[in-house]
Amino acid sequence: DTLEAVYAATFHTEDALVRPQITCGTHALALALMSNLRPGDELLSPVGKPYDTLEEVIGIRPSKGSLAEYGVTYRQVDLLPDGSFDYDKIRENINEKTHLVTIQRSKGYQTRPTLSVQRIGELIAFIKGIKPDVICMVDNCYGEFVDVIEPSNVGADMIVGSLIKNPGGGLAPIGGYICGKQSCIDRRTRSEEHTSELQSL
């Protein structure tokens, strides 16, 4: 509880879940997604393709237990050739089913630029202007502590990451975190049974 209070205070969020049982960033993202999406909901990525490791979680590549298998649909809007957001396409792809928007801060294995906190804030403001109740989640892996503010300071409802990377200083062998609104980090997210189930992904 003390460590989670420190994370919530550090990232200026209402709540935090920080556990060694969350084995890595992909596991933390899977836990956050599966705890906040239900059959009939839609997941939108407005910054292009996510990490390869998330493709089976989402169901872009067929996988047992994926979001797609449970009736969650997925839409993706690629960045424009100059790396800017395709606001017109994003607007077109937000609909009554859009429940969660995932924003990957790092460029990962893509050639696009890594997103600054300022740009993430602008994107979230645009999305919330269209659908205020949508959950905006930021994959914060590799982005922690490289700026004076975090995505949680500019409107992100959840930020998710790995303890193996920046927060662990290269020393932590395992662990992950989810920081954000209490409504996004509910009892289901904290369920040890649910966490164990996701360790197989």
Language-model segments: which ranges?
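Active-site-flanking structural segment that lines cofactor/substrate pockets
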Residues: 1-17
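Conserved PLP-enzyme active-site core in the AAT-like
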Residues: 2, 15, 23-196, 200-201
